[in-house]
From Swiss-Prot:
This is Protein RecA. Pfam families: RecA, RecA_C. Disulfide bonds: none annotated. ATP binds at G67, P68, E69, S70, S71, G72, K73, T74. Signal peptide: none annotated. SMART domains: AAA. Keywords: ATP-binding, Cytoplasm, DNA damage, DNA recombination, DNA repair, DNA-binding, Nucleotide-binding, SOS response. One of its GO terms (molecular function) is damaged DNA binding. Transmembrane segments: none annotated. The gene is recA. The lineage of its organism: Bacteria, Pseudomonadati, Pseudomonadota, Gammaproteobacteria, Enterobacterales. It is found in: Cytoplasm. GO terms for biological process: DNA recombination; DNA repair; SOS response. It comes from the Bacteria. PROSITE patterns: RECA_1, RECA_2, RECA_3.
Amino acid sequence: MAIDENKQKALAAALGQIEKQFGKGSIMRLGEDRSMDVETISTGSLSLDIALGAGGLPMGRIVEIYGPESSGKTTLTLQVIAAAQREGKTCAFIDAEHALDPIYAKKLGVDIDNLLCSQPDTGEQALEICDALTRSGAVDVIIVDSVAALTPKAEIEGEIGDSHMGLAARMMSQAMRKLAGNLKNANTLLIFINQIRMKIGVMFGNPETTTGGNALKFYASVRLDIRRIGAVKEGDVVVGSETRVKVVKNKIAAPFKQAEFQILYGEGININGELVDLGVKHKLIEKAGAWYSYNGDKIGQGKANASNYLKENPAVAAELDKKLREMLLNGGNGEQPVATAAFADEADETSEEF
């Protein structure tokens, strides 16, 4: 419907005044908002990137990853850091649990020499550090491990047994209000790792809940529920975990999708195993009996051997990864995905060796 000419002039003057006072981009028409094409960072898992719909976790947003103990929460966030660092981004890890293992992080591909790390004494200190890093505009990814370990100062200074009802929830609620706008302006991804607790007296429905109150649930653009659903074995030896991630909330694409992948001990997410499974599913890899073939060439007998072939031939893995992303991700813009870039780097290194 056409707007009256006088109203158009008044609106244009108002928009000009708002932009002059608060800066360009402070108000715009939704259809012109370029930020709708959200920049993402790969999770390190191709199937999870596809389940998220946008190719990874969104920049400038808050993400919550929660699940039981030893389900792969920290491993997943370290894979995100490794993917971000390969793109030249600056990352920070707020280790409230004081449990980060730098040797394990290095095995997953994290550049620990350039990873900012803080082990705060109180929850308020941790969140103030997050805010300071965000406002600097120089940090691209911040991980907080974990919400449950963000202990309010009053609780630390008090005695064991003292009642501190709702302190952590109030602290998180205030922090979310302060951080959300700054993260958008700085285009910084903030990931909170969270733990699960049981609600007492729940007869029907799911008794599980996350710590830190409800504010994080509302402010998070993406919430991921990660679970260990089985073991990966070589003979009788357990070498990893079968993992399922459910996208419980998603503001950038359709929610409730699931991804399943393997986390191998000391190696992280088995991306080559994912490429084999997805390649077979979408008919890019042929499977005849136990043999796997790609482009007419046999690449291995059994999934493990096919995965090893892709590991030893990163150029082939990069090509397969690119084809799968172009086929399965919506709104492809022709740019090289993060994971493909990582494979390409390995391919370059391999060609230099020979």
